[in-house]
Curated annotation (Swiss-Prot):
Family: Belongs to the universal ribosomal protein uS13 family.
Pfam families according to UniProt: Ribosomal_S13
GO cellular component terms attached to this protein's record: cytosol; small ribosomal subunit
Chain's role: Located at the top of the head of the 30S subunit, it contacts several helices of the 16S rRNA. In the 70S ribosome it contacts the 23S rRNA (bridge B1a) and protein L5 of the 50S subunit (bridge B1b), connecting the 2 subunits; these bridges are implicated in subunit movement. Contacts the tRNAs in the A and P-sites.
GO terms, molecular function: rRNA binding; structural constituent of ribosome; tRNA binding
Disulfide bonds: none
Protein name: Small ribosomal subunit protein uS13
Gene: rpsM
Keyword Ribonucleoprotein included in the entry's annotation: yes
Lineage: Bacteria, Pseudomonadati, Pseudomonadota, Gammaproteobacteria, Cardiobacteriales
Organism (species): Dichelobacter nodosus (strain VCS1703A)
Region spans: Disordered: 94-118
GO biological process, one term: translation
Length: 118
């Protein structure tokens, strides 16, 4: 197992697909990382040399991924809630933030239905 950004990247997958297992790296960013590191995107991780894996590590370290990114996102949400802006209030009340309807849908965000007690 190759270890990049503190994550065991799957060795049986192509470099582009394997990089997407790191939080904060999608397909387009994975292609960009492979291009910067001069690694063929269709080459499997187990077939990469140590220098190529090290080049991938070096390029990935330039981006904010995994724990740092999770911390940044949670701090951004906390900042919105502290400001008391509309988006922060929606986060605080566990409701959809981006204008979706809530009369009939939004069950994932609101949680299971609670019966009305009479």
């Amino acid at each position: 197992m190759a270890r990049i950004a503190g994550i065991n990247v799957p060795t049986q997958k192509h470099a582009v697909i394997a990089l997407t297992s790191i939080y904060g790296i999608g397909t387009s960013r994975a292609k960009e990382i492979c291009a910067k590191a001069n690694v063929a995107p269709d080459k499997k991780i187990r077939d990469l040399s140590d220098s190529e894996v090290e080049a991938l590590r070096q390029v990935v370290s330039e981006y904010q991924v995994e724990g740092d990114l999770r911390r940044q996102v949670s701090m951004d949400i906390k900042r919105l809630m502290d400001l008391g802006c509309f988006r922060g209030l929606r986060h605080r009340r566990s409701l959809p933030v981006r204008g979706q309807r809530t009369k009939t849908n939004a069950r994932t965000r609101k949680g299971p239905r609670r019966p009305i007690k009479r």
